């Protein structure tokens, strides 16, 4: 798969996985890792009436909790469920998915017909998560040159980090 990126080994992809998801695409529960991003939901809802200023819909990023109510379910999955009740497509476009935390909003550019299809693929296979990363690098962010510059030198990684995570990447 790394050959699709013109690479000869998997060191770069492993480094991305380590930064994006601590190296795993799965929670201990067996569910794929997601991060519900309330500011993305706010952006994607089609009707302003469905915008509820709360922990699951807000114009400001934040409130990334793991299990605030201690029920054993990752909060991102709970927030996603509540958002789906308001606006399903917007909700599914508002999560970053899997080992490489690719946003659901990029489902079409990554070759899926719907964001639920992208989430389902990533829930079934780690290989699908790797394929999603390759598709994102080549088709969405178009950051292959920055990917090829990744190295153990942090300065050489900045261009990729900025392109992959946006201008505010240093906050994370």
Task: Name each model-derived stretch.
Residues 2-172:
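Catalytic glycan-binding domains that act on GlcNAc-containing polysaccharides
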């Amino acid at each position: 798969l790394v050959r699709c990126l013109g690479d000869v080994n998997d060191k770069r992809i492993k480094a991305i996985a380590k930064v994006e998801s601590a190296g795993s695409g799965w929670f201990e529960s067996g569910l794929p890792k997601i991060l519900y991003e309330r500011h993305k939901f706010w952006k994607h809802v089609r009707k302003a009436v469905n915008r509820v200023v709360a922990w699951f819909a807000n114009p400001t990023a934040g409130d990334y909790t793991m299990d605030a109510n201690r029920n054993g379910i990752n909060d991102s999955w709970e927030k996603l469920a509540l958002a789906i009740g308001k606006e399903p497509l917007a909700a599914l476009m508002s999560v970053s998915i899997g080992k490489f935390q690719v946003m659901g909003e990029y489902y079409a550019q990554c070759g899926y017909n719907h964001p639920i299809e992208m989430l389902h693929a990533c829930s079934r296979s780690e290989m699908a998560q790797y394929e999603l990363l390759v598709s994102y690098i080549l088709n969405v962010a178009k950051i292959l040159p920055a990917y090829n510059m990744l190295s153990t030198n942090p300065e050489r990684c900045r261009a990729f980090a900025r392109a992959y995570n946006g201008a505010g990447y240093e906050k994370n």
